[in-house]
């Protein structure tokens, strides 16, 4: 065939339909690599989450690789400790303790994790770049990429930044199917990224 490999977003909270897509690809001899497996990477907001040597990155990696149709995981790593952490996840089966940790995390971030579905963004009368702003805030808060995030935010045309969100009715909140406080998060992101 024409394609030998593709990459898709996949995590343990959303994208349930991805498994079927990956399976259909595998049946046609197409390999799948996945990324964004950590579902927002917000574990530092939940200090009791990672116990007994378990880590969210390792559990999420094992979860993704437990799907026989997933060939590889793409993960951002910025130091050797992270490389060791991810390598420690490979070749080991996903255990019950990890499944339980992933479920606790999923429950904790359900209304905090942006799935980038775009529904809230389309409800915004000011055309604020909600998905981009959420992504840059995530990079700032959870990936240690403060300078990059601020640069990226500064590249958004001013009228699409969150500078007006404080005076808004919050159509984005009402539109979010996951109950996120989108407006509040955008205001916080604006303060953080300017």
Question: Which positions does each model-derived feature cover?
Answer:
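Beta/alpha (TIM)-barrel catalytic core signal, keyed to glycine-rich beta->alpha loops juxtaposed to Asp/Glu
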Residues: 1-119, 123-128, 132-135, 142-157, ...
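Residues that form generic nucleotide/phosphate-binding pockets
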Residues: 105, 136, 188, 192
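Flanking helices and flexible, charged tails adjoining ferredoxin-like Fe-S electron-transfer domains
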Residues: 143-194
